[in-house]
Curated annotation (Swiss-Prot):
UniProt keyword Ligase present: no
A Gene Ontology biological process term: actin filament depolymerization
Keyword Magnesium tagged: no
GO annotations of cellular component type: actin cytoskeleton; cytoplasm
Protein known as: Actin-depolymerizing factor 3
Keywords (A to Z) from UniProt: Actin-binding, Stress response
Gene: ADF3
Induction line: By drought stress (at protein level).
Length: 150
């Protein structure tokens, strides 16, 4: 179904790849783009489970908008984690980030369509936990992810 604000639909493949990431943990990340006709969000790239964060950031073009989801694994060390993990005091956690990538070099029309489709697309991805917006590589680093998980 098309987004009421932008008229952009979401392909079934987008939903399927997201579910594989969320429920099956089959992928580390999925990058999405709006097709050239500006009618539908489609899958642009899927990162294998062993992919690093740098592979996600390398998948985001310097002159084009994208959406992405990233399954970020990290550990916590606090009283709850200590009780759950035993002596080590660290417990594994995972958060799914939704990234809206809109670099300064992208054309204005593309930025407008991505911005107006953003909320509708996120609603199709049930299970996203943290929302990030980035316009520059410095806004999308492991330190930024860490800040959102601590």
């Amino acid at each position: 179904m098309a987004n009421a604000t932008s008229g952009v639909a979401v392909s079934e493949e987008c939903k399927a790849r997201f579910q594989e990431l969320r429920a099956g943990r089959a992928h580390r990340f999925v990058v999405f783009k709006i097709d050239d006709a500006m009618r539908q969000v489609v899958v642009d790239r899927v990162g294998p489970r062993d992919a690093g964060f740098d592979e996600l950031t390398a998948s985001l073009p310097a002159d084009g908008c994208r959406y992405a989801v990233y399954d970020h694994d990290f550990t916590v060390s606090d009283a709850t984690a200590t009780a759950a993990a035993g002596e080590g005091g660290e417990a594994p956690r995972s958060k799914i980030f939704f990234v809206s990538w809109s670099p300064a070099a992208a054309d204005v029309r593309s930025k407008m369509v991505y911005a107006s489709s953003n909320e509708g697309f996120k609603k199709e991805l049930d299970g996203v936990q943290i929302d990030l917006q980035a316009t520059d590589p410095s806004e999308l680093t492991l330190d930024v992810l860490k800040d959102h998980t601590s």
